[in-house]
Swiss-Prot record:
InterPro entries per record: Huwentoxin-1, Huwentoxin_CS1
S-S bonds: C54-C67, C61-C72, C66-C79
Source species taxonomy: Eukaryota, Metazoa, Ecdysozoa, Arthropoda, Chelicerata
Organism listed in the record: Cyriopagopus hainanus (Chinese bird spider)
Keywords: Disulfide bond, Ion channel impairing toxin, Knottin, Secreted, Signal, Toxin
Cellular component GO terms held in the UniProt record: extracellular region
Entry protein name: U3-theraphotoxin-Hhn1a 14
Keyword Signal assigned: yes
GO molecular function per UniProt: ion channel inhibitor activity; toxin activity
């Protein structure tokens, strides 16, 4: 009887240890993609958007002219792609 209690306690302790190890490795795996994505999409001063002479897609075109390939929408005053039926 004592031998069975000891083996059950040892088995239970082994399962708890296995759970802790698996949980720790899984939490490390969850953090890895977050760290990877944050390093990929980190904003660097060298890559900040520069001021343009023309307005790009979905930018206001009241004061600036739209860049090549875009037209100023008469309804919304944004630079948009030209509609195929308006060419």
């Amino acid at each position: 009887m004592v031998n069975m209690k000891a083996s059950m306690s040892l088995t239970f302790a082994g399962l708890v240890l296995l759970f802790v190890v698996c949980y720790a490795s899984e939490s490390e795996e969850k953090e890895f993609p977050k760290e990877m994505l944050s390093s990929i999409f980190a904003v660097d001063n060298d890559f900040k958007q520069e001021e343009r002479d023309c307005a790009g897609y979905m930018r206001e075109c009241k004061e600036k002219l739209c860049c090549s390939g875009y037209v100023c929408s008469s309804r919304w005053k944004w630079c948009v792609l030209p509609a195929p039926w308006c060419r």
